[in-house]
Amino acid sequence: MSHSLRVIFAGTPEFAAAALAAIHGAGFPVPLVLTQPDRPAGRGMKLQASPVKRYAQEHGLAVAQPPSLRRAGKYPEQAAAAIGQLRATPHDVMVVAAYGLILPQEVLDIPPLGCINIHASLLPRWRGAAPIHRAIEAGDAETGITLMQMDVGLDTGAMISETRTAISGDDTTATLHDRLAQDGAKLIVEALVELERTGRLAATPQPAEGVTYAEKIGKHEAALDWRRPAAVLARQVRAFDPFPGGVGTLEDGTSIKIWAAIPADTKAGGAPGTIAEVTPEGVVVACGEGALRLTQLQKPGGKRLPVREFLAGSTLAVGQRFQLPEAK
C-alpha cells in the first residue's frame, strides 16, 4: 500500500532504524533522512555510519548529517545549511526517534503538520536520554512507548498515544530495547495513517505529577556498590546490559564484568563484597541486604561466559573480596 503523507525522518541508533524501516516499508514517502555524523567505533576506531544511515543508503533515501541544527551553536554554517535543506524539501510531517540533536523552535516550526517524537517510556515518567535503562534500574513493573507532539522542552510535548509492556524479571536493556523498538515502529505507522486520513492528531498535555528524568548512563555508574541490597544490584546489572555492564573489582585490582546476576536464596555471611560461595551455579557475594548470585562473567579482554565456563579459567575463591566503591 502506498501513502501520500511525506515524512522527513530524524534518528540515529537501532531503535530509530526500526521506526524508519516501518514507515518506509508501509509505503510512506521519505524525502529526507537526518541522522548524526559518522562516529569512530570498534577496536580500529574507524568511522561508522549510524543504523539509520545504513538503512537509508540501502533503500536509496536522501541523507543529511548536520553536526547541529542550532544557528547559535558550535556549527552555525552547517546548521543553517541543514535548515535550508529542510525548508527546501517538500514534506508534511517530521518523525523524530533517538536523534540525539536538539531541535530548536525554528526547526519544529518547519513541518506543516509538526514534529512527532517516539519516546521509550510512559511519559511524563523518564523524560530524557536513558529511559529504558532507568525503568529497569528503578524496578518499574511496566514501561512503554509514548508518541508526542514535540516542543522545545526535554520530552515535554503533548501526548498523542502510548503502548505499554510489562518489564519481566529477566529483561535487560537489550531485550526491552528490542521489544520497544518494534512497539514504537508499529505505533508511529498507526499514527501516520490516522494523520493522513484526518489531517490532525489529538494530543493531551502531560500531567504535572509523576515527572522523572532518565539521565544518560555514565561509565562511572558501572561499579557495583556491594553495600546496597542484592535486589537493587540485580536490577542494576540487567539495566546496564549491554552498556556499560556491571563491574566488580577484586581487592587485588582485577576487574570483572558482571553480565547476569540474581538475588541468592541462600544467606551469605561476611562483609559486603565478600565471596561466600563458588559453584558452577554461581558465585555468591554478600551484599548490604541479602546476597547476589553472579551467573555470567567476563575477564578483561575475554568473552562473556556462563559462570561454569568462567570458573574453569579463574581462581575466584570463597573469602575473596570485591572492593567497595567510594560512597557517593
Swiss-Prot record:
The UniProt record lists the keyword Transferase:
yes
Q: What is its EC number?
A: 2.1.2.9
List GO molecular-function terms, semicolon-separated: methionyl-tRNA formyltransferase activity
Top EC category: transferase
- Family matches, as CDD domains: FMT_core_Met-tRNA-FMT_N, Met_tRNA_FMT_C
- UniProt catalytic activity: L-methionyl-tRNA(fMet) + (6R)-10-formyltetrahydrofolate = N-formyl-L-methionyl-tRNA(fMet) + (6S)-5,6,7,8-tetrahydrofolate + H(+)
Q: Name one GO cellular component term.
A: cytosol
> Which residues are listed for (6S)-5,6,7,8-tetrahydrofolate binding in this entry?
121-124
The record's keywords, sorted A to Z, are: Protein biosynthesis, Transferase
Family indicated by similarity: Belongs to the Fmt family.
The UniProt function text for this chain reads:
Attaches a formyl group to the free amino group of methionyl-tRNA(fMet). The formyl group appears to play a dual role in the initiator identity of N-formylmethionyl-tRNA by promoting its recognition by IF2 and preventing the misappropriation of this tRNA by the elongation apparatus.
The name under which this protein is listed is Methionyl-tRNA formyltransferase
Source organism per entry reads Paraburkholderia xenovorans (strain LB400)
* Name of the gene encoding the protein in the UniProt record: fmt
